[in-house]
């Protein structure tokens, strides 16, 4: 995982001011890892703001709205 400088652009594209609810954790394979401050769940975004999740060791693209809700509300997938 690459550390700093933090890249907030993908998250800002999607949620604007709500970025304050997240911590930037690092970058890996061109994807930005953000952690929600309350639920402690990760939101993984590419440069265009598309969402990904880890499934069986692979990164799979998923619907942003559903993934954002899961992360923010602490909903199990």
Where is each model-derived feature located?
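Mixed-charge, Lys/Arg-enriched low-complexity segments
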Residues: 1-14, 52-77
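Acidic, low-complexity, intrinsically disordered interaction modules
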Residues: 19-61
């Amino acid at each position: 995982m690459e550390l700093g400088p933090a890249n907030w652009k993908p998250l800002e594209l999607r949620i604007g001011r709500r970025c304050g609810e997240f911590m930037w954790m690092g970058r890996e394979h061109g994807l930005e890892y953000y952690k929600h401050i309350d639920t402690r769940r990760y939101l993984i975004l590419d440069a265009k703001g598309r969402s990904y999740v880890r499934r069986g060791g692979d990164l799979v693209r998923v619907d942003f709205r559903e993934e954002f809700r899961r992360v923010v509300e602490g909903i199990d997938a």
